[in-house]
Amino acid sequence: MSLTTTNLTSLAATSAATLLGAYALHKMFKNTLTSSPKYMVTDVVAKPGGHYSPAVRHENSLYVSGILPFYADGTFCQGSLEEQVKVVLDNLKLILEEGGSNLANLVSVRVYVTDVEHWPRMNKVYKEYFGEDCKPARAVVPVGALHHGFLVEVEAVGAII
């Protein structure tokens, strides 16, 4: 094959298109892999009592910190286990929505209870929030004690779609 002006022009155009495509993919892939976490600041739930964020958004995931049964004004819910679970799940719902997700897009949930005997009662309230079809991966972890004498704490990971 002899190199003519037409062949060289075609070769140059193909090479340029390939390089531009590769560069565009590189930029897109690089930006996806190097996005920084975004720390949530919100007033829809009580302000954290420690050095942490209520949730952190990274790429298409929302990581929700452990939620205790505080009302938005910072007062405690010292009611029954069922009342505490409702306050916690209401707060989870608010945080997820603020971060661009919702209960239906949860990937995993970790529930801490102060006694494994609380599991059936906690599960009944939990099911009211999630229904029959929404079943994110979940662990229920019995712990010795939680801050302020609370009976339940929940942390979760949600997908942002």
Segments predicted by a language model, with ranges:
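N-terminal presequence-like segments and the immediate start of the first folded domain
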Residues: 2-90, 94-107, 113-161
